[in-house]
Amino acid sequence: MGKKRSVSSQRWLKEHFDDQFVQKAQKKGLRSRAVFKLEEIQKRDKLIKKGQTVVDLGAAPGGWSQYVADYFNGDGQIIACDILAMDPIAGVDFLQGDFREESVLEALLERIGGKNVDVVLSDMAPNMSGNGTVDQARSMYLVELALDMCHQVLKPGGSFAVKVFQGQGFESFLKDVRAAFNDVKTRKPESSRARSREVYLVATDYKL
C-alpha cells in the first residue's frame, strides 16, 4: 500500500486541480500555470520586446520560455537554464545544470556572451523542506544569485523580473534591487495563489 498523503499535501492537490489557472493551462496545452504570471506582468509592464535577448533562470518545465518564444515568433533570443530537464522549445537555447556550480555558470555566461542581455527572468524556487526559516534562506540565496547574474549580463537600461518570497531578507534584497535599477515595482499576479508569500519584483532601467 502506498504511503498515505498528509493533510497538507491533500489540500495542495485539491487546490491544484481546482485551480482555474491550472485548468486553463491544461486546456491551452501550456507547460505550467506560471505562464499566466509572466503574461500578466508583460501586459502591465511591457518588459519584453521583439528582437531582445532574454535569459530565463529556473526555466523548467518551460512555461516562461514558451511564452517568450511565442511572443518573439522567431525575432529574439532566449537562453534558459535549470537544474531539471526541460523538453525542447523552438527558439530556446537550453542549458541543463545548477548554475551555482562554477562550470555551469561559466557555460551559461559563454552562451550569453557578455553584457548584451535585455531582460533577466527568474521564477526560481528551492525545493521546500517544510522548515520555514531554512526555505526562506534558500529562496533568498537564489534571488541574490539572479541579481548577481543581472550585474554580469544586463545591458544598461535592461530589465529584471524575479519571484521573491516575503520574509527574512526580503527588505534587504529589495534595497539592493532598487540600488541597481531606476524603477522597481512589486507585483502579485492574479494567478499567484492568495496564501502564497510569493511576489514578483519588476525592475527596469538597469543603471550599474
UniProtKB/Swiss-Prot annotation:
- Location (main, coarse): cytoplasm
EC category: transferase
Name any one GO molecular function.
rRNA (uridine-2'-O-)-methyltransferase activity
Q: Which InterPro entries match?
A: RNA_methyltr_RlmE (IPR050082), RNA_MeTrfase_FtsJ_dom (IPR002877), rRNA-MeTfrase_E (IPR015507), SAM-dependent_MTases_sf (IPR029063)
Which EC number applies? 2.1.1.166
Query: Source organism's superkingdom?
Result: Bacteria
- Pfam families linked to this entry: FtsJ (PF01728)
**Key words of the record:** Cytoplasm, Methyltransferase, rRNA processing, S-adenosyl-L-methionine, Transferase
Query: Has keyword Plastid?
Result: no
Q: Can you list the GO cellular component terms from the UniProt entry?
A: cytoplasm
Where is the protein situated, by its record's location annotation?
Answer: Cytoplasm
Q: Binding residues for S-adenosyl-L-methionine, per the UniProt record? A: G62, W64, D82, D98, D123
Active-site annotation: K163 (proton acceptor)
The reply to whether Iron figures as a keyword in the UniProt entry is no
Reaction catalyzed = uridine(2552) in 23S rRNA + S-adenosyl-L-methionine = 2'-O-methyluridine(2552) in 23S rRNA + S-adenosyl-L-homocysteine + H(+)
Q: Which NCBIfam families match?
A: PRK11188.1 (NF008390)
Protein family per UniProt: Belongs to the class I-like SAM-binding methyltransferase superfamily. RNA methyltransferase RlmE family.
Function, in words: Specifically methylates the uridine in position 2552 of 23S rRNA at the 2'-O position of the ribose in the fully assembled 50S ribosomal subunit.
Q: What is this protein called?
A: Ribosomal RNA large subunit methyltransferase E
What is the protein's species of origin?
Idiomarina loihiensis (strain ATCC BAA-735 / DSM 15497 / L2-TR)
